[in-house]
Design a protein with these regions (language model features):
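ATP-dependent adenylation/nucleotidyltransferase module used to activate substrates
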Residues: 1-117, 224-226
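ATP/NTP-dependent adenylation/nucleotidyl-transfer catalytic domains that generate, transfer
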Residues: 121-123, 127-226
Length: 226
């Protein structure tokens, strides 16, 4: 069966991802986007679970109108628990694309047994000292806030660049949620990675519970001096 193995470069996967693919799986075609993730944030703001424009632009666009084999599994999350081995995409933008999921019933244990049995190379981030359970976009909004914080703390330079991108968006879009409710990029980023309602955030800020030095708070958390 002829197939084309593709990696969509989201520009925000963990460092070393592309060299790893080139060294170990040279047959994989690396597709680069027209806009990077940071450029998208600077133009559209932070993504969210309900507003995943980053997935549409950076991950799914290559599969429009095609039959795609993907590695998603039911036991990865509650959202994927109802996935079928094959399902067609009803979104107009995907133009009838079909998603074939050959591993949909596999467990995590079966995945690792297969990897070790066949001695398949995999990224170092699954092993100590990282111990990641997933390899994907750093700070993905589909992950928990706790996972987002862990990933940004592991890769602090990504976080700093994201602060700069949202700052640019806020300056050019002052009428939006991020532009209206936050004073600077560090403040917006702090809210983005924490489990706080906007009401609670504003109350805590008014009460000076944050001491309102979000740049210092973010940098201290990330362990950097800037």
């Amino acid at each position: 069966m002829k197939f084309e193995a593709v990696y969509s470069n989201t520009t925000i996967d963990p460092p070393g991802t592309i060299p790893f693919i080139r060294d170990n799986y040279p047959e994989v075609k690396i597709v680069n986007p027209k806009e990077s993730f940071l450029q998208l944030v600077a133009r559209k703001g932070f993504p969210s679970r309900q507003r995943r424009f980053c997935c549409e632009v950076l991950k799914e666009s290559y599969g429009v109108g095609k039959r795609n084999l993907e590695g998603m599994r039911r036991d990865e999350s509650n959202n994927r628990a109802g996935y079928e081995p094959e399902q067609c995409d009803s979104r107009k933008s995907m133009k009838g694309a079909c998603h074939v999921l050959p591993l949909v019933f596999w467990t995590e244990r079966q995945i690792w047994e297969y990897i070790h049995k066949h001695n398949l190379p995999y990224m170092k981030y699954y092993d100590p000292p990282y111990n990641f359970t997933r390899h994907g976009c750093v700070g993905c909004p589909l992950a928990t806030k706790q996972q987002m914080r862990i990933e940004f703390k592991t890769f602090p330079r990504y976080a700093i660049n994201l602060v700069k991108a949202i700052k640019k968006f806020m300056e050019t879009h002052p009428e939006t949620f991020w532009g209206k409710n936050f004073d600077n990029g560090h403040e917006a980023f702090y809210y983005y990675i924490n489990d706080l309602s906007l009401q609670d955030f504003k109350f805590m800020k008014t009460a000076s519970m944050f001491k309102n030095d979000f740049r210092r708070m973010v940098n201290n958390y990330l362990g950097i001096n800037e």
